[in-house]
Amino acid sequence: MTDKTPLKPSAKLCLVAETLSGPEWSAIVAAALDATAAVTLVLVPAHGASVIAADDARPLVELAQKRDCAVLLADDAATARGIGADGVHLTSREDIETAYGIARSELGPRGIVGVEAGTSRHDAMSLGEAGADYVAFTAGTGDETDLDAQSDLIAWWSELFVVPAVAFAVGPVEHVARLAECGADFIALRVPTGQSPAAIEEWARSAVAAVRIEADAA
C-alpha cells in the first residue's frame, strides 16, 4: 500500500480537438490518439467559428474510428449523423434539456448523446434521468478553486449515480490524477494547436502518466 488513493480503474482519457482542415492537423490528432489510446474524440468548431464544417470533420472522424475511437460532434447532431460520427456532445446552456431531446430524436437510441452540465447538479440529475450517455462537469478557468468544485461534483456524482461522469475542460495535465481519484470515468483533455506531432506525443505521454491508467496493475 502507498499513501496515495488508487485511481478508479475505469478512468480513461478522451480528447477534444478543433475541427481544422489539412493533413498536418490530421497527423497531430492521429498522434494524440495513438499516444493516449483515447476512447472518445470530441470535435469542436475551429477557433473563431460557430459551427463545425462537415468537410473538415469527416477525415478526422474516419481516422479516429479506424482506431476504435468514438467520435462526437459538439452541438451538431444533424452533421454528426450525416457524416457517420458516433454521436454528439452538448455543451452547457440554459435549454440543455430541450437540446438533449432534440439530439436524441435526431440520433435515435443507438447514437451517443453526451451532455455538459457545467456545475449544475440539477441539470446533471435531470439529464441523467432523461437517458444521457454521460454527464460532463466543467471547471471554469481551470484554477485550483475551480478544480475543487469540479472534483466535488464528480465525487458526488460517482457515489450516487451509474451514468458515467466526465471531467471536461480540464486545465493543466497535473489536474488529471486528482480528477480520476475523485471518481471520474473519463478525463477530457483538449489537443493543443500549433505544435508538432512529436510535441503532441510528449504532451500525450504526460497525460497518460498523470491519469495512471494502469495503476491498479502496478
Say what each PLM segment does.
Residues 30, 101, 155:
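Active-site phosphate/pyrophosphate- and oxyanion-stabilizing loops and adjacent acidic/basic residues
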Residues 139, 155-170:
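Catalytic-face loop-and-helix region of soluble metabolic enzyme cores
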Residues 47-50, 54, 142-150:
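Glycine-rich tight-turn/loop motif centered on a GG-T
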Residues 74, 116, 137-138, 168, ...:
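Generic beta-sheet signal
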Residues 108, 147-161:
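Conserved catalytic cores of soluble enzyme domains
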Residues 92-102, 134-147, 180-207:
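Glycine-rich phosphate-binding active-site loops on the catalytic face of alpha/beta enzymes
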Residues 1-89, 94-95, 106-113, 119-132, ...:
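Conserved N-terminal beta1-alpha1 strand-loop-helix module at the mouth
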